[in-house]
Design a protein with these regions (language model features):
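Short coil/linker segments at helix-helix boundaries
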Residues: 165-185, 236-266
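Membrane-proximal, proline-rich intrinsically disordered regions
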Residues: 18-72, 247-248
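Polar, glycine-rich mid-to-C-terminal structural blocks
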Residues: 232-234, 266-350
Length: 452
């Protein structure tokens, strides 16, 4: 059977892969793989179209009912409360927050399928690169193969992190009968070792900057992911999480630059590489999330967004804001996601010691747009009530207004789809997180973490 591949003309120019497809450009496999350029586009670049997404359970961030929600709405950071007739959704969000999801959860299954779909696409890309290696130079094939392996490692990281014991499939033609589950520790080792092997062949470039390497996995992206694996090694190396016994990170070893280090030392060393590469904390915190945030000195890995080029979407501001809030910005909104009361307490909301970053991350109290106060349809001012949040707000006088709402990203007033297609790149990895990882690793290794 001939596989059908898509070539996007815009993809040749941007090399990001996250592009709208033109159905007229579909070609057979033999037609597609006719040059080095086409081989790159159809075996490497196309994979980046799956890091973001435009539909439910697709993309690592930006959409709903997928990786982001299962890593956020299941924590004490955020929740989507039931607001009368809104947001019950068959108990989806309530079950997420209260950890009552089951194996029959449709959205979780769709997330699983999405992650493994990309893994299998990577496996096929590796086979294609080998089959058509005569079209490109040896250095190009080595570089592209390394990049595909890095993308696959990234997705296996999320699979391993979310699901634990999972099938580890590394070829495109493995019969279903041969697929078996691998221990979580094995998948952890696979991801780390893959990144270690391909690291010398990844570009030593910033991935968040527009240009040839924009949105791609480069060497700093791999360092960051490896550091995250090392920091969480006690969890990932634990194949029996029911016995109450966890491995000791000081005894879990990783290789960095050919040297064996314990998990905490490895994490510290990898974070130091990011510092040496030139990453810094952005002097103005909010600049990391500007409409045009490609110049950030802090962002390590982002999902490129451009409403005129990419189909990737970013739903979270739209999903969080009250209807009147969205209307005041010239669009719509869903009045859903809110920060938990615990999050408010962490930020010191309403206290003399309130974190200065609070106003950049949340809407609370009255809301003003362009100097005008946002009003409800009743004629009363919109007032968000952060401390009135609970799982089920039905019947509460704050049914529609409880909870602080997401801000963080600068509002793109020229965005499409009621704000779901802005130009702000979605930030996946930041240097600030690397500093926190380094500090934690140092403390766990017996130091005080003060030099992080």
């Amino acid at each position: 059977m001939k596989r059908i591949l898509a070539i996007s003309a815009i993809g040749i120019l941007t090399l990001s892969g996250c592009l709208k497809e033109d159905s007229r450009s579909y070609l057979t496999q033999e037609q597609a793989f006719t040059s080095a350029q086409n081989l790159y586009i159809n075996s490497v670049a196309l994979l980046y179209g799956y890091i973001g997404g435009s539909g439910d359970s697709q993309g690592l961030q930006g959409t709903c009912r997928g990786v982001y929600d299962y890593n956020t709405m299941t924590t004490d950071e955020a929740m989507i409360p039931i607001r009368g007739g809104d947001w019950y959704d068959g108990g989806l969000w309530e079950n997420m927050y209260q950890h009552k999801w089951t194996s029959s959860d449709a959205s979780l299954y769709e997330t699983w399928k999405y992650l493994y779909k990309v893994v299998m696409l990577c496996n096929q890309s590796l086979a294609d690169l080998q089959a058509y290696s005569h079209l490109a130079s040896e250095d190009e094939i080595r570089s592209w193969t390394s990049e595909v392996r890095a993308v696959r490692a990234l997705f296996y990281f999320y699979i391993m992190d979310m699901f634990g014991r999972v099938p580890l499939v590394t070829a495109a033609d493995v019969p279903v009968s041969d697929v078996v589950q691998s221990e979580r520790s094995e998948v952890m080792r696979f991801v780390y070792d893959e990144l270690t092997e391909v690291l010398p062949h990844l570009a030593p470039e910033r991935s968040n900057r527009q240009g040839k390497w924009y949105g791609r996995i480069t060497r700093p992206v791999a360092w960051f992911l490896m550091a995250k694996i090392a920091l969480n090694a006690e969890v990932y190396a634990d194949d029996d999480w029911t016995d109450g016994i966890r491995p000791d990170g000081s005894q879990v070893m990783f290789e960095v630059d050919g040297i064996q280090m314990n998990a905490w030392e490895a994490c510290t060393s990898l974070c130091d590489k990011l510092e040496s590469f030139g990453y810094l904390l952005e002097p103005v915190y909010s600049d990391n999330f500007l409409v045009h945030n490609e110049g950030s000195v802090e962002n390590v890995f982002t999902i490129p967004l451009d409403k005129n080029l990419y189909r990737n979407q970013f739903w979270y501001l739209f999903r969080s804001r009250h209807y009147s809030h969205g209307g005041a910005l010239g669009g719509a909104s869903e009045n859903g996601t809110s920060a938990t009361i615990h999050t408010m307490e962490v930020y010191g909301y309403g206290t003399p010691g309130q974190d200065a970053r609070f106003v950049h991350n949340f809407y609370a109290g009255e809301v003003f747009i362009d100097g005008s106060q946002v009003m409800l349809h009743t004629g009363e001012p919109l007032v968000y009530m952060p401390m009135e949040l609970k799982v089920n707000l039905t019947g509460s006088p704050y049914e529609k207004t409880a909870g602080a709402r997401m801000a963080k990203y600068e509002v793109d007033r020229k965005s499409f789809s009621d704000g779901r297609q802005p130009d702000n790149d979605i930030v996946l990895f930041r240097y600030a997180d690397a500093l926190l990882m380094k500090a934690e690793a140092q403390v766990r290794n017996g130091a005080d973490g003060s030099d992080a």
